[in-house]
Structure formats: C-alpha cells, structure tokens
UniProtKB/Swiss-Prot annotation:
NCBIfam families: miaA (TIGR00174). Catalyzes the transfer of a dimethylallyl group onto the adenine at position 37 in tRNAs that read codons beginning with uridine, leading to the formation of N6-(dimethylallyl)adenosine (i(6)A). This is tRNA dimethylallyltransferase. Coiled coil: none annotated. Gene3D superfamilies: 1.10.20.140, P-loop containing nucleotide triphosphate hydrolases. The keyword tRNA processing applies. It is an enzyme of class 2 (transferase).
C-alpha cells in the first residue's frame, strides 16, 4: 500500500464518511480525517463525527483527538497526518483521507509555508490588543506592516488578520516573507485517487436541514451546553463550529430553540456552498467529481 492513497472530499452532508468506511472495509484501509472541526473531542454530535460503532468497523485516525481549548492549525494537522499516513503504509493499510477542509488537502498534496510557531504569550498579547477593535482597523494595521500579506487577506477575515499580526509580532518579519518557502506535503509524489462528492443542490440542502434536526435529537444541545460551561475564548475554532454560536445564543436566552436550529441549518448550507466553490477553483483537474450515487456504484458494488 506504500505510495498510494484515496482522497475523498466534498461538502458537508454529502456522504463522504459512509463511502470512506465502505472503502476501508472492502480494501483493508484506514480512514484518516481531513475535517477541521471533527478533530475536536468536544463535538462528536454537532460535527457529525463517525459513531463509536463506525469507528470499530474500521480503523479511524485524527478524530476527536484535540481538546477544544487548542487552536489547532493546518501545521498541527499536517504533522499529525504525516505520522498516521506513515503508520498506515508501514502496516500495509490503504490510507483513505476524507473530509471537507480544502486547506488540509492542499497542504497534504502541496505542502505548507515554513512559518515558525507563535509563542502562546505573543498570541495572547496580540489578541488582547485587538479586543474591541473592528477587523477592518486591524487589517489597516497589517497593511502598514505587511502590504503584500494584507493584500492576500480579506479585510473582514479576522482570524487570518490576527494570525498575520501574531507572526509579525513573534518574528519581526511579515507573513509574506515566509510564504515563498514550502515544506513538501506527505502526499507529494504519492499515487492518489482523488474524489469529490457533489450531490445535487436541492438534495444537499434537504440533507443538511434533516441532519441538523437529527443532531438535535442526538444530544447536540447538551454537547454545546458542556462546551459553554468551559468558558473558552469565543475566537477559538471549536466555538465557531456551525451550530455552536446559535445554540449558545439559545442557551443564553437570546434565541428560541427554533431560531437557533434555523440559524445552524442556514450557516451549514452557506458553508457547503463555499466548500464547493473553493474546490472548484483551488484543486486540479485530476480530481473526479461524482455524485454520491455514482461513487457508491463504482467503488462499493453490492452495497
């Protein structure tokens, strides 16, 4: 199996996990997560992580292994994914990388800029200085310090603006100075079968809405209640997962349950649209776009 992998991408609720599990069972594979929210242990239900029964049916890696208090970066993911890929090949298992986070796939295939880590004290200081300020104002600061880097970041993208300011504060150098040098990705030179699941739009919207209701029935609100009790920084990725802000607003009395559900459904539908758009413009022509039904017929005959 060394030097081979299957990559399965697609929007949320497109059936990626079911296809990955079926392939892992049929081909002796190991399922490797490529979803930036499913890494967090706090949100099994709300991020639609594989169930314990599914995880027992085939090996699964990089699911729920990160605490919600951690700001888990693409660099962290790349290091973890490189390790589990090597372990899979050493065990003669086929890696099946599945998820909807485009930057994870891009980093696996193309590598990542060699940006040094930012000390936590520096990160905290930058965020404390930024608290209460508009993102556009922070972006203007960045434009003065790093015009080239600021030009690559939307003025409203607070997380990326803060990240660039943190790097400047930690290293004394602009983010753009590091973006020319790349460390190769662990899938560089690997024979990869690349699949993108693309359901029809109406069907996907219906699945997203129905799945959110199922999540509520399965305990999503209790999950968010436990997360809220931790009093984490609202800027952390886990606190911005689809459904979390609306359900916290409901727990705080600002939204009804029905309003929180509607917000979670709408946020997830918008995210799915962005996922499709990103992949359409960012990945190469060697990715095969299939409907979930086409993929099942081709790769899981008899299922």
């Amino acid at each position: 199996m060394a030097g081979r992998a299957i990559l399965i991408a697609g929007p949320t609720a497109s059936g990626k996990s079911a296809l990955a599990l079926g392939l892992a069972q049929a081909r002796g594979g190991v399922v490797i997560n490529a979803d930036s929210m499913q890494v967090y242990g706090d949100l099994r239900v709300l991020t639609a992580r594989p169930s314990p029964e599914e995880e027992e049916a085939a090996p699964h890696r990089l699911y729920g292994h990160v605490d919600g208090a951690v700001n888990y970066s693409v660099g962290h993911y790349l290091a973890d994914a490189g390790r589990v890929l090597r372990d899979a090949w050493a065990a003669e298992r086929l890696p099946i990388v599945v998820g909807g986070t485009g930057l994870y796939f891009k980093a696996l295939l193309e590598g990542l800029s060699a940006i040094p880590p930012v000390p936590e004290a520096v990160r905290a200081a930058v965020r404390a200085q930024a608290e209460g300020r508009e993102t556009a104002s922070l972006h203007a600061d960045l434009a003065r310090l790093d015009p080239e880097g600021a030009a690559r970041i939307a003025p409203g993208d607070r997380l990326r603006v803060l990240r660039a300011l943190e790097i400047r504060a930690a290293t004394g150098r602009p983010l753009s100075a590091f973006q020319g040098s790349r460390q190769p990705g662990p899938l560089a030179g690997v024979a990869c079968e690349k699949l993108f699941l693309a359901p029809d739009r109406a069907g996907l919207r219906a699945r997203i809405d129905a799945r959110f209701l199922s999540m509520m029935e399965a305990g999503a609100l209790d999950e968010v209640r436990r997360l809220r009790a931790r009093h984490l920084d609202p800027m952390l990725p886990v606190m911005r997962a689809h459904g979390v802000p609306g359900l916290i607003a409901h727990l705080n009395g600002a939204l009804t349950r029905e309003e929180a559900v509607a917000r979670g459904q709408a946020d997830t539908r918008r995210y799915a649209k962005r996922q499709v758009t990103w992949f359409r413009h960012q990945v190469g022509e060697d990715w095969r776009w299939l409907t979930p039904e086409e993929a099942a017929r081709e790769f899981l005959p008899g299922h």
